[in-house]
Amino acid sequence: MGSVRTNRYSIVSSEEDGMKLATMAVANGFGNGKSKVHTRQQCRSRFVKKDGHCNVQFINVGEKGQRYLADIFTTCVDIRWRWMLVIFCLAFVLSWLFFGCVFWLIALLHGDLDTSKVSKACVSEVNSFTAAFLFSIETQTTIGYGFRCVTDECPIAVFMVVFQSIVGCIIDAFIIGAVMAKMAKPKKRNETLVFSHNAVIAMRDGKLCLMWRVGNLRKSHLVEAHVRAQLLKSRITSEGEYIPLDQIDINVGFDSGIDRIFLVSPITIVHEIDEDSPLYDLSKQDIDNADFEIVVILEGMVEATAMTTQCRSSYLANEILWGHRYEPVLFEEKHYYKVDYSRFHKTYEVPNTPLCSARDLAEKKYILSNANSFCYENEVALTSKEEEEDSENGVPESTSTDSPPGIDLHNQASVPLEPRPLRRESEI
């Protein structure tokens, strides 16, 4: 009993090398226009990697450093931890050095560095730069060993003590806030949200559907989880404009609300290939020769922090298996449901899947087989349940030819045998 709904993680397929001659439609750029333009283009590079990172590099950005410094807090949150640690240490060390220099200059101008002078010092026991640096550390960290202290001899020294205390509080608040914000980022939550290696196209409820599977490895829920998908493909407009990366939304039930999912067990997300789908005119052969990328997105709020997280992956055309379904992963036990993640990425072939496009199927150009074959998913689920019941009842497998009680051996041939469906192994 597989999951009832239809929507990360995949093996990165090898990219084709070299250049190829592609035929692009001028009308809409998806192979169903009348006018054809032959152009030589390079095989598509993955826009979104399988781990969710975008394969994009920014170049020639004007005033990049100034723009990043203007938003220093976000910059500190986004940088790596090693640089965050460097900024953390430098912020304190530089502030201690700055105020240490200030107190050393105050002592120098007041003549406190002259040990022969008997007048009252601005800061007692500060007669060198090292002593001034230690006094700066003691002031900002409120250590207060008791040997060095400011006096009322110099108002400027009193002001600098107050000013350093305020600056120290600001640095503490900024650094601690940035560290906490970085720790609370739900970025690592994506590691426990997985997409299937491949997407599949198969019949569901009499219609061709594009499907992919998503799962949550944690027991903590993803609140308000919902899915989105986009098809990325280059095309040429009717005016001759070349769009290298055209983004087309793929409907996964936004209008009906089924894009919002309850992600407790793995769920199969379904896109019905109808007349509004960008895959409506594509057959199996077209998919095999196509050059596009489907980006899938899962969004939701982390239950522990209530922060929004986004998990991404993508499927190239050669990662879409036509005529396959996912093996079931959800099984009903006696008092609970069991999820077997060893089957999460596995698929099996459905022989009766039409090879034509959804348009041809809707226009009755392809006759569906009426053969009522027992579904492999149900067979796996029922077999698992029967084996569990047999193990609980302690019924051993009998190899004896003894007949059951109450049945005559001469009339045994008239007793109908229990129909057992033939098991077909999964072809992955």
UniProtKB/Swiss-Prot annotation:
- Tell me the intramembrane segments: 129-140, 141-147
The record's annotation in Gene3D superfamilies points to: 1.10.287.70, G protein-activated inward rectifier potassium channel 1
Q: Which SUPFAM superfamilies match?
A: E set domains, Voltage-gated potassium channels
Cellular location of this protein?
Cell membrane; Cell membrane, Sarcolemma, T-tubule
Q: Which Gene Ontology terms cover its molecular function?
A: identical protein binding; inward rectifier potassium channel activity; phosphatidylinositol-4,5-bisphosphate binding; voltage-gated potassium channel activity involved in cardiac muscle cell action potential repolarization
Q: Which InterPro entries match?
A: Ig_E-set, IRK_C, K_chnl_inward-rec_Kir, K_chnl_inward-rec_Kir2.1, K_chnl_inward-rec_Kir_cyto, K_chnl_inward-rec_Kir_N, Kir_TM
Gene Ontology terms: biological process:
cardiac muscle cell action potential; cardiac muscle cell action potential involved in contraction; cellular response to mechanical stimulus; magnesium ion transport; positive regulation of potassium ion transmembrane transport; potassium ion import across plasma membrane; potassium ion transport; protein homotetramerization
As stated in the Swiss-Prot or TrEMBL entry, residues carrying the post-translational modification S-nitrosocysteine are: C76
Q: Where along the sequence does the record place the motif called PDZ-binding?
A: 426-428
Which keywords label this protein?
Answer: Cell membrane, Ion channel, Ion transport, Membrane, Potassium, Potassium transport, S-nitrosylation, Transmembrane, Transmembrane helix, Transport, Voltage-gated channel
Recorded topology in the membrane: Multi-pass membrane protein
Instruction: Spell out the PANTHER family in the cross-references.
Output: INWARD RECTIFIER POTASSIUM CHANNEL, INWARD RECTIFIER POTASSIUM CHANNEL 2
| Subunit structure, as described in the record | Homotetramer. Homomultimeric and heteromultimeric association with KCNJ4/Kir2.3. Can form heteromeric channels with Kir2.6/KCNJ18. Associates, via its PDZ-recognition domain, with a complex containing LIN7A, LIN7B, LIN7C, DLG1, CASK and APBA1.
So what family is this one in? Belongs to the inward rectifier-type potassium channel (TC 1.A.2.1) family. KCNJ2 subfamily.
Recorded protein name is Inward rectifier potassium channel 2
